């Protein structure tokens, strides 16, 4: 056992010396590796031939293995270290290359390639012309639609800006400077106010005449069919009269409140000019309505 331990220490020291020598002389390492490989092959062949003997004892085999294993153990680490050094030198010399990228071919290129391979016919020409015509028609229709939309938007803008343009011009032409002759302007304002009151009175009289005519016709119809009327019909008529009276009173209250609050200074809510025509429903009476 002591002999084997001493033998291993010698092997390790020889391996360190060989590695230092290999680092200093890399060219000699290559030749040493080749020699060690040839020696290992020859030793293996000798062992195989010696192992075929019949009168060989197990103790002799162990001693022979120990004696034969010493050169192999001496040479095997040298060969491994020399191969490692050669690999490291080769790896230092090699430069890292970028990874190749394979681009995918587009379907259009494949179609073009197939079309080039195929023979060209008159039908293909007709088909190409037809597709060109269809594309041209589509582009023309699209351009026409865009122009039409532009015209409609332009008309809408013009109509929005031109509403009540005449009324705006008349309002701008009015002389609202009261500092020149304040008394005269005040007198004109009273005249306009009286005209508005008379106009409102005429409208109310027309409504009153219409309601009186309706009541007169209703009274005549009641007198004609008085015998056929029942108690239930009379009650309905009375309730209807009460409702009409309530409606009339509520309308009078609204008119009074409107007359009282008509000329109060309030904050403007709608800046846009409305249609103040006589036939319109949203007709409002103001001091400029007489114009």
From Swiss-Prot:
Question: Domain of life, per the record?
Answer: Eukaryota
Its primary localisation, in coarse terms, equals: nucleus
The Basic and acidic residues compositionally biased stretches are 239-258
According to the record, the residues making up region (Disordered) are 1-99, 239-266
Q: Give its localization.
A: Nucleus
Q: Which GO terms describe its molecular function?
A: RNA binding
Which controlled-vocabulary keywords does the entry list?
mRNA processing, mRNA splicing, Nucleus, Ribonucleoprotein, RNA-binding, Spliceosome
Q: Compositional bias of type Acidic residues: which residue ranges?
A: 63-91
Start-end of Polar residues biased regions: 28-41, 52-62
* Gene Ontology BP terms: generation of catalytic spliceosome for first transesterification step; mRNA splicing, via spliceosome
Instruction: Provide GO CC annotations from the record.
Output: cytosol; nucleus; spliceosomal complex; U4/U6 x U5 tri-snRNP complex
Similarity remark: Belongs to the SPP381 family.
Q: What else is known?
A: Present with 2510 molecules/cell in log phase SD medium.
The record describes the protein's role as: Component of the spliceosome and rRNA processing machinery. In association with the spliceosomal U4/U6.U5 tri-snRNP particle, required for splicing of pre-mRNA.
Q: How does it assemble?
A: Component of the U4/U6-U5 tri-snRNP complex composed of the U4, U6 and U5 snRNAs and at least PRP3, PRP4, PRP6, PRP8, PRP18, PRP31, PRP38, SNU13, SNU23, SNU66, SNU114, SPP381, SMB1, SMD1, SMD2, SMD3, SMX2, SMX3, LSM2, LSM3, LSM4, LSM5, LSM6, LSM7, LSM8, BRR2 and DIB1. Interacts with PRP38.
Protein's UniProt name: Pre-mRNA-splicing factor SPP381
């Amino acid at each position: 056992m002591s002999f084997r331990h001493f033998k291993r220490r010698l092997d390790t020291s020889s391996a360190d010396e060989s590695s230092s020598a290999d680092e200093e002389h890399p060219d000699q390492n290559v030749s040493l590796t080749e020699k060690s490989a040839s020696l290992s092959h020859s030793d293996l062949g000798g062992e195989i031939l010696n192992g075929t003997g019949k009168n060989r004892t197990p103790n002799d085999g162990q001693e022979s293995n120990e004696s034969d294993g010493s050169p192999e153990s001496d040479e095997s680490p040298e060969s491994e270290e020399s191969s490692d050094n050669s690999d490291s030198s080769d790896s230092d010399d090699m430069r890292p290359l970028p990874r190749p990228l394979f681009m995918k071919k587009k379907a259009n290129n494949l179609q073009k390639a197939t079309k080039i391979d195929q023979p060209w016919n008159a039908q293909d020409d007709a088909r190409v012309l037809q597709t060109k015509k269809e594309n041209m028609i589509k582009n023309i229709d699209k351009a026409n639609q865009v122009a039409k939309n532009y015209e409609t938007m332009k008309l809408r803008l013009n109509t929005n800006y031109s509403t009540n343009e005449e009324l705006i011009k008349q309002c701008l032409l009015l002389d609202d400077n009261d500092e020149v002759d304040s008394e005269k302007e005040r007198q004109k304002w009273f005249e306009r106010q009286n005209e508005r009151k008379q106009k409102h009175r005429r409208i109310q009289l027309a409504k009153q005449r219409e309601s009186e005519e309706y009541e007169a016709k209703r009274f005549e119809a009641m007198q004609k069919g008085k015998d056929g009327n029942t108690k239930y019909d009379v009650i309905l008529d009375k309730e209807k009269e009460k409702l009409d009276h309530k409606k009339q009173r509520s309308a009078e209250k609204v008119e009074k409140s409107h007359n009282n609050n008509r000329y109060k200074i309030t904050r403007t809510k709608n800046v846009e000019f409305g249609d103040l025509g006589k036939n319109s429903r949203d007709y409002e009476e103001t001091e400029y309505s007489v114009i």
